[in-house]
Amino acid sequence: MKKRILSLLMTLCVAVCFVPTLAFADETPTQTVVTIDVGGENVENTDYKIDDTRIILRTKDKVLYELTGTTDKKISVWGSNNAADIDQAFYIKLNDVTVNGGIVVENSPVKMVIDVPTGTTNKINRVSANDLTIKGSGTLNASDLSVTQKTSYMPSALHITDTTINVTCPSNKYSEFNGPCVLDGSANVTYVGGGLYAPLHVGEKSGDTTHSLTLKDNAKLYCLQDDMETPASASVNGLEIFNAPLLLEGNSYLEAEGKDSTSKYKGCGLISQNNITVKGNAAIKATGYDVGLSTAGNLEVNGGKIIAKSKDSNGIVAANVTIKNAEAEVEGYWPALYGSSAVSIENSKVTAKANDVAIYSPDKVAITNSIIKATSPDGCDGIRGNNGTTVSGSWIETSGDETFADAPDSITDSVLFNGKTGKTIGNHQIPGDVTVEKDMKLDIAKDTSITVPDKKTFTNHGKIDVKGSFAKEDGGTVICDSHSGGTATCVKKATCDVCKAEYGDIDASNHEGLKHVEAKAATKDQEGNIEYWYCEECGKYFADKAGEKEIAQADTVIAKLPADPAADQNAGTKKKDSSASTGDDSNLALWAALILLSGCAAGGTVLYRRKQN
């Protein structure tokens, strides 16, 4: 039993010992570093030779050549005609070296791996190989960097990782990529043309079905012109892609520019015979005097951004144009965005401007949950599909008068601006950040609505008339500096129909709480009042129902009626006898009083006469 356990442990140890060998089997083989001062004296050994005209590298795989110094000589390398040797490579490390003669493949295809260490700046006038790998975060300057065309037994390939490469082409030269070509990491590659040719051709070898160009991670590729202000004598494009699909993904970036020309043929920014695909956060900028971005295949943008502009032609030309979850800025003299088979825009923001229809297909145009701004001259539609344009859930600003109301066109749950005047169709939820500019007017019709959802912003600088409804969901943002709607009262400012903020001044004449009080006659016991109106909001009194004739509260009061004095005195001398007086008793008392009064008067007269006598 112990022997069996010991045997298992020994087997495990042996397996572990071989792990490093297996893991790194495909990586750089064990090598001897051979340092060469390229400006050094003539010398010859088994690994290299320096003579009066050149430097010859002799050993593949087993040697890492570290190059330093400066020379006008060329470096010569030889490949092999033996198919079994195609995986053998020359390994070269650049250490602030200048080789004005370049690295020249003298015969047969060559595989080459070049290391450009961080912090180094190097110049190799010409670099080419059938299978070329360049890595390291340093800088390499050249006048030509190419992947040559495949042979019967060695395919072409390119892989650039992290390196900054600047290629300035002579006026009569261009560089080419063949086979599968990949730029990744932080590769930053710039080609500048000399004025007669596109600086970079991709997939030039006919019959090779392996051609492709892929940009990944943060890789960048620039195909520029030496002098954009001076026209060429013929068409000079920025980047020419033949039988090779183009793929950008991650945060990669491609920029290409075409030149003006004194001939009738101008330069395109990017011209391709195959499909172009943009994913993630990648971006393409293509500008030219002919088409900005032209492909005989399909253009598919799923994420990222496209900028394509032309002075004298279309911004984008492709068979099928599909823009999804992306942003596009397109300008042209002819239709800025042209899809010969179809144009489909979904969850995207597209700005298109042309001296013709801005967004056009001879077949169909479909726009879904997108923001579109299409600008064309007077008399032109901004957006047109000859076999129908369908719009759904989108914010459309077009300079044309198209309504999409008649078949085969259709529009649902959208906002449509024709020029500066817009309206809602159905119930629209904005698909992204939108703005009503200062000179724009939007009518939200009855039974229609606009909703601002989470993480979206609605900005209003213009005029909005809300007869339907405007709502903001949690997380949505409304920015409004041009308020409208609502009603001011005697105590409150108006509330904006859009942002729900109070604005303006109070309206002292608008009394929403005006209460009518009917007139009431006064009595001896209670005051009365005139007819009047009282505002419960501001506490004021008015003599009219319009609330225009303000009065004091005291003016509404009618005083009590005055009291009767005689009635008050009689009330104080009433008999305590509970029996009612008769009319006879009353007359008897009256006569008795009169007799007594007459007697007194007669007595007074007799007494007066006696005294006279």
Predicted regions and their residues:
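Positively charged n-region of N-terminal signal peptides that target proteins for export
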Residues: M1-I5, M10, R609-N613
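Sec-dependent signal peptide cleavage junction
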Residues: F18-T30, D577-L588, V606-R610
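Ser/Thr/Gly/Pro-rich low-complexity, disordered linker/stalk segments of secreted
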Residues: K467, E473, L561-A580
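C-terminal membrane-anchoring or membrane-association module
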Residues: S598-N613
